[in-house]
Amino acid sequence: ARAVSRRGAEGLMQLMPATAADLDVQDSFDPRDNIDGGVRHLKRLMARFHNNVPLALAAYNAGEQAVINYRGIPPYRETRQYVVRVLRRYDREAARLVAQQLAAPKSSTPKIVRVSYAGGRAVTAPVMPALTLAEGGKGAQPDKKKSESP
């Protein structure tokens, strides 16, 4: 399926064509190319907004210029709902990682890091190995080469 939003954003990461071109995404409908571009775009927005996750998310959804013009999250209903949904999911995933490590055998004591986002609650979570898709796309496996500190 070729995912296209009503505003023209394309692919899994819903990149606008101009953004995809700026990121040198050759095919917005190729999952690898689209996800790579989307991740680079989000990383760039995180740097632009000084690691302020809500602002970076708002810029990803509404556009960087809208966040700059409004000096914060724009008053667009869709954007505000998007930021809230993503941050709630972020909180759930951080809590899941903590619970997973608390249930792990004591012999596998992880390093502890602080997971937070600007303006929000912080939780303590373990460093988890980076995950890569297993051969054949049948799940995720730890990537031992990309493990350890964030």
Predicted features by range, described:
Residues 1-109:
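Catalytic glycan-binding domains that act on GlcNAc-containing polysaccharides
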Residues 88-150:
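Cell-wall glycan-active module
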